[in-house]
Design a protein with these regions (language model features):
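A compositional/biophysical signature of low hydrophobicity enriched in polar/charged and small residues
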Residues: 1-113
């Protein structure tokens, strides 16, 4: 309770097994944007935040500008989502996809001293 009041705990959640709820297809997607123009980047971020299939999203360094963790019912659903991404965000230059073969560790636990 004290950690919640201090703002250390953002929210309480349940970690759901994606396979158990029919979302067993999981993907790690790297997105590269054309330009770091503020309004275009914010449009992409709004789209990412509004899409329920995107579980996590990170602005990163390296070859990609963003890395997304995505769940889907199958490859076809993922393909539709990526088509929507490209249509809604012309500033996206390209994306790369890693298909998750199996989950080694899943959670949002942060060690606290």
């Amino acid at each position: 309770r004290r950690r919640e009041e201090a703002g250390n705990i953002e929210r309480r959640i349940a970690v759901v097994n994606p396979e158990a709820v029919g979302r067993g297809a999981q993907f790690l997607v790297g997105i590269e944007v054309e330009r770091e123009q503020r309004d275009l980047v914010e449009k992409l971020r709004r789209w990412i935040r509004s899409e329920p299939s995107i579980q996590q999203a990170y602005y990163v360094t390296g070859s990609a500008d963003y890395v997304l963790v995505i769940t889907a019912t199958d490859i076809a659903a993922f393909d539709r989502l990526m088509s929507e991404l490209m249509a809604a965000n012309p500033n996206v230059r390209r994306f790369t996809t890693n298909v998750v073969m199996s989950s080694v560790k899943r959670g949002l636990y942060v060690p606290v001293d």
